[in-house]
């Protein structure tokens, strides 16, 4: 059983390969439990590889000086992780048939499935958990709707409810605003801020600094599989640092702890 310890993730001197490419060379990072973090970087920075490391889908190269621990454990099962880390990936949307009912999309997460609940049995407690997760995301009114009739933003919030139905210790979001329009992105960022205020720990992976909610104070910048900067949002998200990260001149301004980035 995974231990109850102070760190969510401890990585030291990890080398992670994706095929023949060294995606994370000599990578070290600690994320504490109770801490919310944003991982920021351009395409190809190593964000998706880091995410797979965090969720146990990939392992680092075996070396004496390397260690990788989740919740203090070097060995774990994906089943254990699934109950302690809720993961939301944009591509999950395509796993559901258009006729799938929204509440069934959420319930099926409890069985590690994507809908198709006809032969599944759910207890009143299961249904209560699904209803609570949907209410928290503001999509309880959509419970009886077919997945194919929902907007992109509504589908994304259903996916987050799926992740939260397990009552995980941390929620991991990969590029949550992908394919969303401006209004849906705004609603989503407000939803994330509400989740953080309610005590949900969040690891947000994005390439948009403007999506980082005020409640997230630690930001880690990745480029070419290496950590370019790691620290307080107010210091890391500067015009100079982001211009270096994205290799274009950028100007950063702030509005009520939301970061705004424009061409310089």
Short names for language-model regions:
Residues 167:
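Conserved catalytic motifs of ABC-family nucleotide-binding domains
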Residues 55:
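Helix-to-loop junction immediately C-terminal to a conserved catalytic motif
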Residues 120-121, 146-150:
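Conserved ABC ATPase signature
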Residues 171-175:
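Catalytic Walker B motif of ABC-type/P-loop ATPase nucleotide-binding domains
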Residues 107, 122-142:
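Conserved ABC ATPase "signature" region
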């Amino acid at each position: 059983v995974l231990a109850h310890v102070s760190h969510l993730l401890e990585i030291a001197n990890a080398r992670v390969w994706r095929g023949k490419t060294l995606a994370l060379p000599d990578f070290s990072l600690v994320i504490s439990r109770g801490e919310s973090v944003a991982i920021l970087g351009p395409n190809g920075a190593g964000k998706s590889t880091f995410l797979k490391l965090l969720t146990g889908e990939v392992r680092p190269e075996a070396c004496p000086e390397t260690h990788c621990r989740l919740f203090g454990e070097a060995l774990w099962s994906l089943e254990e992780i699934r109950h302690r880390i809720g993961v939301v990936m944009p591509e999950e949307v395509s796993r559901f048939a258009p006729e799938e009912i929204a509440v069934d999309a959420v319930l099926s997460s409890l069985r590690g499935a994507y809908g198709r609940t006809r032969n599944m049995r759910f207890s009143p407690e299961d249904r209560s958990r699904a209803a609570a997760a949907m209410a928290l995301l503001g999509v309880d009114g959509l419970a009886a709707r077919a997945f194919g009739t929902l907007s992109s933003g509504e589908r994304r919030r259903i996916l987050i409810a799926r992740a939260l139905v397990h009552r995980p210790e941390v929620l991991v979001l990969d590029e949550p605003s992908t394919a969303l329009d401006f209004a849906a992105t705004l609603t989503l960022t407000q939803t994330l801020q509400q989740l953080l205020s309610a005590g949900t720990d969040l690891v947000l992976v994005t390439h948009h600094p403007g999506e980082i909610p005020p409640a997230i104070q630690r930001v880690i910048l990745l480029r070419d599989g290496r950590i370019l900067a790691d620290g307080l949002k107010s210091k890391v998200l500067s015009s100079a640092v982001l211009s270096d990260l994205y290799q274009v001149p950028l100007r950063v301004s702030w509005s009520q702890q939301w970061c705004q980035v424009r061409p310089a």
